[in-house]
Amino acid sequence: MTKLASGIVILALASTAIWAAPAFAQMGKSNPGSGEETRSAPGGADIKLGDAKPIAPPKIEADEASRAPILDEGKAVESFTVLTRSADGKVSRSSPSEEMRGLVIEDMKKEAGKGSMKLEKSGDPSFANEEEAGRQVFGPDDRVQIQNTKVFPFKAFGYIEAKSKTGTGSCSGTLIGPRTVLTAAHCLYSNDDGGWLTDVLFAPGLNGFEDAPFGAYAAESTSIVEGFVTNYQGFYGSVVPWDLGIITLAEPVGDTLGWLGYSNYDGLGDFTANIVGYPGDKDPPALMWRATCEVVAENVGTENFGYDCDTYPGSSGSSVYAYDEGLKQRVVVGVNIAESPEYNTAVRLNASYVALINSLWK
């Protein structure tokens, strides 16, 4: 794999200040859920899945790094303005707080891998037990099907459908709170296809269109950062650092199913990445698959990191998580967003994004 900075679009920020003390945002801790029976999905039998075309991960072309926008501190801060669309179509705008302003500027000055908060890495113990994970390998493909999606952590991962101007698309997402789902911004907003996607649904633990063990849940609202819209210059590489989205569900399904934790490890280096989602190249569709690969420190940037885990259309929005042996928890450190000629790409949960998620967490 090639060093991250050479092939992936990294946010170009004009700043001459030296790197200062690390900034932290309070991490979100995981919760395995109550295990009680879930409530009926909003709309019940009226909610139907299966008409969607998997949303392809945007491609970062080789020349896009040189065309990425160069932002000063003020523009970078304003890029973290939150845009929220409610289910009835109303869009609100929330400017960054003073705390957020400080974190964004701090993140601009950081050097990748330089920090005191380290990940005590280990493999996810769920994958060490084939019976628990219900896994099956097909041919040379290193992705693994999760057959038992009704156990934690797999019931915290879900299938997303949403409507654009030209059709219905599917992505993947992860519960990180009772009503909070983490995904990619391009699963919620299309710069090339009319803006906001509508009628967003989340089906946790989906195991094929005929087996939705926990139902499908409607979004109360969806949120992205304004930089994903205002910094777009006609090519995806111009908005890579802002490709993170939040779905707020109308129902607190996470209280029952549980959710994953999330954090900004400012000293993030080598670690084992786990990606669980719904790639669209498998038949039958809408089955849950996982991919695992090693991320090397040289491919970890301050806003993004690269890896060679297999991902396909439909995998967009999947969380990238690591197992922290010290915490004995699965911790989300990024979101799978794009592909490039050399490797796949995640937006990294830095201090700014963790604070943003905390502000929207429900």
Predicted features and spans:
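Bacterial N-terminal signal peptides that target proteins for export
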Residues: M1-I8
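Protease-domain processing segments flanking chymotrypsin-fold serine proteases, especially trypsin-like
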Residues: A25-L175
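Conserved catalytic-core segment of clan PA serine endopeptidases
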Residues: Q136-K155, E161-T166, Y189, G194-G254
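Sec/Tat signal peptide C-region and signal peptidase I cleavage site
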Residues: I18-A25
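Chymotrypsin/trypsin-fold serine protease catalytic domain
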Residues: V240-G314, N344, L349-N358
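Bacterial N-terminal signal peptides
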Residues: V9-A17
